[in-house]
């Protein structure tokens, strides 16, 4: 019976330490020191008036024209390859296949910056 009591005394302080590791949120913390367990509960942070005033000031100074998105990037590549007539490659007879030269390095097809690896 004494061995069970000793084992329980050894396990209980470790259980208090494990609580902080098993929690899914950082809203509370548990620590064990000398057999006592202390649970600390923190309130979630809310937006302060100072932070809200700063964000409002920041939005007021941002020029809107600079952040507008273009429909296409100015350096974006134009359509480099014309489609095959009737979607058929005249050299191989492939229907609906990729247009242009065969893959050049590492066996990759690359069109407009997108790579397909075969």
UniProtKB/Swiss-Prot annotation:
It holds the Pfam family DUF1674. One of its GO terms (biological process) is cellular response to reactive oxygen species. It is found in: Mitochondrion matrix. InterPro entries: SDHF4. It comes from the Eukaryota. Residues 65-118 are annotated as: Disordered. GO terms for cellular component: mitochondrial matrix; mitochondrion. Keywords: Chaperone, Mitochondrion, Transit peptide. The keyword Transit peptide applies. Residues 1-30 form a transit peptide. Residues 66-81, 105-118 have a biased composition (Basic and acidic residues). One of its GO terms (molecular function) is enzyme activator activity. Belongs to the SDHAF4 family. Interacts with SdhA in its FAD-bound form. Plays an essential role in the assembly of succinate dehydrogenase (SDH), an enzyme complex (also referred to as respiratory complex II) that is a component of both the tricarboxylic acid (TCA) cycle and the mitochondrial electron transport chain, and which couples the oxidation of succinate to fumarate with the reduction of ubiquinone (coenzyme Q) to ubiquinol. Binds to the flavoprotein subunit SdhA in its FAD-bound form, blocking the generation of excess reactive oxygen species (ROS) and facilitating its assembly with the iron-sulfur protein subunit SdhB into the SDH catalytic dimer. This is Succinate dehydrogenase assembly factor 4, mitochondrial. It comes from Drosophila melanogaster. The lineage of its organism: Eukaryota, Metazoa, Ecdysozoa, Arthropoda, Hexapoda. The gene is Sirup.
């Amino acid at each position: 019976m004494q061995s069970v009591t000793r084992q329980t005394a050894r396990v209980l302080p470790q259980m208090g330490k494990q609580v902080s590791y098993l929690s899914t949120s950082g809203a509370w913390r548990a620590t064990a020191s000398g057999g006592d367990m202390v649970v600390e509960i923190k309130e979630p942070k809310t937006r302060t008036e100072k932070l809200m005033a700063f964000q409002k000031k920041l939005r007021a100074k941002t020029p809107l024209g600079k952040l507008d998105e273009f429909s296409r990037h100015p350096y974006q590549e134009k359509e480099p390859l014309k489609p095959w007539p009737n979607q058929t490659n005249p050299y191989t007879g492939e229907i609906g296949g990729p247009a242009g030269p065969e893959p050049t390095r590492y066996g990759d097809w690359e069109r407009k910056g997108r790579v397909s690896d075969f």
